[in-house]
C-alpha cells in the first residue's frame, strides 16, 4: 500500500439492497471487509450510507404507507437505528469503532457549523474511528435537505479533506448512453472536467429505491474534483472494488481532480447547498464568466427564495443555467428591492448599505 490516504465511500440504496426490497447483508459484510482491510493498512475511511428508509420498511414488515414526506421520515426514524446497529456489528468484528454523523443542509450553509462539522469528522478520523454519515432524513424537510447522498458524500469528502471519493452504484460507471437500453453504450474511463455534454449523457436516471441517479453523481464529482478530490463512479458489486480504487487501479469512471484546487473558503462556497437563487442579465453573465467581475445589483433580474445576508446563493443566466455560486452581501428582500438599480442608489432605497456589490468576486465560484 502507498502512504495513508483518506477515502470517502458512498453506498447507495441500490448497492446495499442489490435491487431487492431488503438489505443485502452478505454484500454489506463484504464491503465492510474491504474497508477494514484498508483501515488496518493505515488508511482513513469515511462511509456515507443510504438505506435508512429501506431498513425501516424492512423492519416494519413493508407497511402500505402513503407516499409522503412524513411516511419517509417515519421509515427513516426506524431504519436509522437499525442501519447504524448493522454497521456497528460488522465493523466490531475487526475491532473497529464507528461514529455516527447525521447532517442536514443547515450544517453546510452556515460557515461556523461547517467548520464544527469538519472538526468533528476529522477528530473521529484522528482517533481511528470510521465515521458513518447520512442525511438526517427523520427530521429534514425539503427546505433543509441536501437532497441526495451523492452530493452529501461530496460535502463529506470536503469536510474530511479526502484524497478520493468513491461513489458505488449498480452501474459500472458513466457510459456514453444508458447501457440498459442501448447495447452500443461504452464506458467512459476518464473525465477531466464536467461539461454540458456530460450532463446530457447522465440524464435523469434514478433507481426506484433511492433518491440519486447518474446526474446527481455527476454533480457530486464536479464539486469534489474542483476541491482537489479524485472521484470514481464504479459498481458496488465488483469484487475488491474499494481496494482497487485505493491502489489506483483502473475501475469505473475516474473524474480527475483539478490541478489547482479551490482554497478552503471557496470549497465551502462551492459545496454548500444554495439557500436561494438569483437570475442575472446577459451583461452580468458576461462580466462574471469572462472578466471575473463582482455582481452588481444593476444586473439582477429576479430573486427566488428567502435567504439571509451571508448565505450561499445560486446565480443563473436568463436561460436558467447555473453560472456561479456566491455569498450574498444582502438578504433576499433587500436584493429584490435593489435589483436593476445602480449601486449608488442602494442607500437611498434601503436606508443602509453593505457596499456596492450584491456578490463580491472573492466570495464567488463560477460553475
Swiss-Prot record:
Residues 275-353 form the PUA domain. One of its GO terms (molecular function) is ATP binding. Keywords: Amino-acid biosynthesis, ATP-binding, Cytoplasm, Kinase, Nucleotide-binding, Proline biosynthesis, Transferase. SMART domains: PUA (SM00359). One of its GO terms (biological process) is L-proline biosynthetic process. ATP binds at residues 10, 169-170, 211-217. Its EC number is 2.7.2.11. It is found in: Cytoplasm. Pfam families: AA_kinase, PUA. The keyword Lipid biosynthesis does not apply. Pathway: Amino-acid biosynthesis; L-proline biosynthesis; L-glutamate 5-semialdehyde from L-glutamate: step 1/2. It catalyses: L-glutamate + ATP = L-glutamyl 5-phosphate + ADP. One of its GO terms (cellular component) is cytosol. It is an enzyme of class 2 (transferase). Substrate binds at residues 50, 137, 149. The keyword Cytoplasm applies. InterPro entries: AceGlu_kinase-like_sf, Asp/Glu/Uridylate_kinase, G5K_ProB, Glu/AcGlu_kinase, Glu_5kinase, Glu_5kinase/COase_Synthase, Glutamate_5-kinase_CS, PUA. Belongs to the glutamate 5-kinase family. PANTHER family: GLUTAMATE 5-KINASE, ISOPENTENYL PHOSPHATE KINASE. NCBIfam families: proB. HAMAP family: ProB (MF_00456). Catalyzes the transfer of a phosphate group to glutamate to form L-glutamate 5-phosphate. This is Glutamate 5-kinase. It comes from Salmonella arizonae (strain ATCC BAA-731 / CDC346-86 / RSK2980). The lineage of its organism: Bacteria, Pseudomonadati, Pseudomonadota, Gammaproteobacteria, Enterobacterales.
